[in-house]
Swiss-Prot record:
Protein name according to UniProt: Uncharacterized protein R467
Source species: Acanthamoeba polyphaga mimivirus
Entry-linked InterPro entries: Thioredoxin-like_sf
Length: 321
């Protein structure tokens, strides 16, 4: 036995190797192909299987060389027809295909088997998650619907046909598409049968009153309608709150007008020139202007605290009380 790729074991010669692979596969899909070098169809399908293995990395493909196998466990080698494809999950065989003729037939069977494995894994996970949750039995019904496995349904159809209609059994083995259609029809019928009791249970749930809403409404009714009032004896020092001058001449305007913007910008320029915008700066008044009377200069603006802004001859501005 040797590995061609990570998920393809070629030339298996012992049933011990098969047991080891199935045990280590755990929850993965395992496909066994029984191969014989003397069978032309077997050699042709081997090439198809090797290509398919490259596109299905999560599944494990095994090629059993029937020409070299000595010890044959009846669990794996029971009425084997070369070429034959057996599908395993959790060390259990759930499907067998014979007389596959094309790569499309193999591809379709592999995809269907992978869907079955995914369904099984999801069903197991849902079963574990729902053990602690039980609501009117709906979870158990949903788990039952999740446990409808396509491969088991397909195998059941083949078993019934083999017992009742051998010709139809042979036809289905040679035509996987027809077998797939019958499987889908059977699954739909099973789901419809399971939905009927589930829908009746859901109807009972809808007719039940919403207990949480009733509790919420009762709590709302117990809320007092009176709104707590703020005590009026809290002293507030209005004089400690500095008054902010309103530069707008029209307080009803949501946005400043162009004239207001021009006035504010002019005032900003004057305050910037005097250093008022910087609290650490002190206004500088030239010495030649300190001895002159304030009445000689034009008053540009009056600040809220009563100080007046004068325009100096050199173009700068000064502030005086």
């Amino acid at each position: 036995m040797y590995k061609m790729v990570d998920n393809l074991y070629n030339d298996i010669e012992s049933d011990a190797n098969i047991k080891e692979i199935l045990t280590n596969a755990q929850d993965k899909l395992v496909i066994l192909m029984f191969y014989s070098k003397g069978n032309p169809n077997s050699r042709r399908l081997l090439g198809h299987m090797e290509k398919i293995a490259l596109n299905h990395c999560l599944s494990i493909f095994c090629v059993i060389n029937m020409d070299k196998v000595q010890e044959r466990d009846s669990r794996f080698f029971n009425n084997v027809t070369v070429p034959q494809f057996d599908f395993y999950y959790q060390t259990n065989r759930f499907a067998t295909y014979t007389n596959l003729n094309t790569d499309k037939d193999i591809e379709q069977c592999v995809r269907m088997a992978e869907q079955y494995v995914v369904t099984q894994n999801n069903s197991r996970n849902n079963g574990q998650n729902n053990q602690s949750v039980n609501m009117f039995g709906s979870n158990s019904q949903m788990n039952t619907m999740n446990q409808i496995n396509p491969m088991l349904v397909q195998q059941q159809i083949l078993n019934n046909m083999q017992m009742t209609n051998p010709q139809m059994y042979t036809y289905l083995l040679q035509n996987p598409m027809t077998l797939n259609q019958l499987t889908q029809q059977q699954i739909q019928q099973m789901q419809q049968m399971q939905k009927q009791p589930m829908q009746s249970g859901m109807t009972n749930m809808i007719n039940m009153p919403n207990v949480s809403n009733m509790i919420g409404m009762s709590n709302m009714n117990s809320i007092p309608n009176t709104i707590p009032q703020i005590p009026t004896n809290i002293a507030t020092n209005q004089s400690s709150i500095p008054s902010i001058p309103s530069l707008s001449t029209n307080n009803n305007d949501p946005l400043p007008t162009m004239q207001q913007l021009e006035k504010w910008f002019k005032l900003f320029q004057m305050m910037s020139a005097m250093g008022i915008l910087n609290t650490s700066a002190t206004p500088i008044i030239p010495e030649q202007n300190q001895n002159q009377s304030n009445d000689e200069y034009e008053i540009e603006a009056v600040l809220p605290d009563g100080r007046k802004i004068y325009k100096l001859p050199d173009g700068r501005f000064g502030v005086c009380k």
